[in-house]
Regions:
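Core segments of cupin and vicinal oxygen chelate
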Residues: 2, 8-49
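Conserved beta-strand in the GNAT
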Residues: 51-53
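Short, flexible turn/loop "capping" segments at secondary-structure junctions
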Residues: 1, 57-59
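Alpha-helical and His/Cys-centered functional microenvironments
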Residues: 10, 55, 68
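Eukaryotic phosphotyrosine signaling hubs
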Residues: 4-6, 62-64
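Vicinal oxygen chelate
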Residues: 14, 65-86
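Short, acidic/polar N-cap/turn motifs at the starts of alpha helices
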Residues: 39-40, 55, 64
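Short polar/acidic secondary-structure junctions
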Residues: 34-35, 55-57
Length: 86
């Protein structure tokens, strides 16, 4: 059966974005290749990886990432602490 291996996301501030996903979802940092001139960090989220690249964020017509969690309340509170809602 096929499955998604990873999702790549651009981040304006890599360190802050890594801390956000660590706090919000409990992701773990995993070995990350060196991309010359581009700060990057790979994260493990269950069997799927999240690849963060520090780059400018370009507008898109549609984007979102759906994640299943065991208990939505603590995740929602963490997202509020990070001011993650538009």
């Amino acid at each position: 059966m096929a499955q998604i291996n990873h999702v790549s996301v651009n981040a304006l501030n890599l360190d802050e974005s890594v801390r956000f996903y660590e706090d919000l979802l409990g992701v773990e940092r995993i070995p990350t290749p060196n991309f010359v001139g581009i700060p990057v960090q790979w994260l493990a989220l269950g069997r799927t990886q999240l690849h963060l690249f520090e780059r400018d964020i370009q507008p898109t017509s549609h984007h979102h990432l759906g994640i299943t969690v065991d208990d939505v309340e603590p995740v929602y509170r963490a997202a509020e602490r990070w001011d993650a809602f538009d």
